[in-house]
């Protein structure tokens, strides 16, 4: 491999000759050989491109940067956003907790690429300086948290929310389709009074609806950007009005409602907005866990389980048991939920580590957040496509379970009293007989009264 010599304030560094990065990026590559290379999320790189372009425009408008340099920086940022420079960002998550080296990776690549676009060669002194121009009016301490918010907001709004809404809509449709299917309810995993399958599915739709509401309610905080706070939140070395102006440009370029942070000190020292939004993602993950568990239990069998619903048969389920089919989409969903719960633990702890004016767990928070947001989106689409949309009632099994339930006796409470109703249920269970048989044998009701009072379809109420 051929190398060229790049310099920073610590001296000379050998850099691969054909790469646009420079000394500080190469030092980080050599110093942090931890985990897979280039593990810094691409969403963070893209977010940096948006903010570097916005900073160039804001600085130029405020007289701190020439329009020539602005246009060169913007041109390279557009190339990054078009995925033309993907191989130029080799750094890992496991680096400085402020993300300084990734910030410099962007600065160096933009400066060197701009020089080449001007007809220069790598290794020559560039017309664009990585610190003085690309990083003008910025610090890693305000750029990385800004990139975190841009990446997180975009992912949640453009990817996660639409996917959850899709699955929520399917459950709402199923709830309406199953509104007349009366089945036995279960509490404590034991038989309970009847409800409709539609009512059961309405709970799933409502869970996701509330989860979406919680998620959307976190977005105003996430939309606040730290950029303009520079090193500790004071805005040192920025032109007047820069913080507001740069946020306006980011909003313009992303077409998302970003604004400057109300308090830059909070925006640098803490990442409560990330914790808050991920908390809503965790809420949704726990809802999905519950839903997936219910569905795989309701579909259990096919002959020796509950078996009240039929789910799509997507692939063989066993390498040894012929004909076995498993609830694989439910299993995938529960594993995703477990991962999100683990990510939330990491994010919550990392968020507590804001010592004085700076939190230094930024990259791991960003990576875990983005993984959760993407996984939840992917699993909602997968579950909707390969499971939820194909769920159908198993009518014979539902009727069999309903007729066999002792908890239908609850309908007699208001006619013969709780204790007499309990006596009927216990006697029927002990003798292996029906509720009707024992109610008549015990002389507590007539056959006509039993048929009039114990009607499952009248026990489901009017709530939907």
Curated annotation (Swiss-Prot):
Q: In which pathway does it act?
A: Carbohydrate metabolism; tricarboxylic acid cycle; (S)-malate from fumarate: step 1/1
Among CDD domains, the record links this protein to: Fumarase_classII
The residues annotated as site (Important for catalytic activity) are 331
Q: Which residues bind substrate?
A: 98-100, 129-132, 139-141, 187, 319, 324-326
InterPro entries with a match to the protein in the record: Fum_hydII, Fumarase/histidase_N, Fumarase_C_C, Fumarate_lyase_CS, Fumarate_lyase_fam, Fumarate_lyase_N, L-Aspartase-like
What cellular-component terms does GO give this entry?
cytoplasm
In this protein, the active site sits at: 188, 318
Q: Key word Endoplasmic reticulum present in the record?
A: no
What family is this?
Belongs to the class-II fumarase/aspartase family. Fumarase subfamily.
Q: What does this protein do?
A: Involved in the TCA cycle. Catalyzes the stereospecific interconversion of fumarate to L-malate.
**Protein name as it appears in the record:** Fumarate hydratase class II
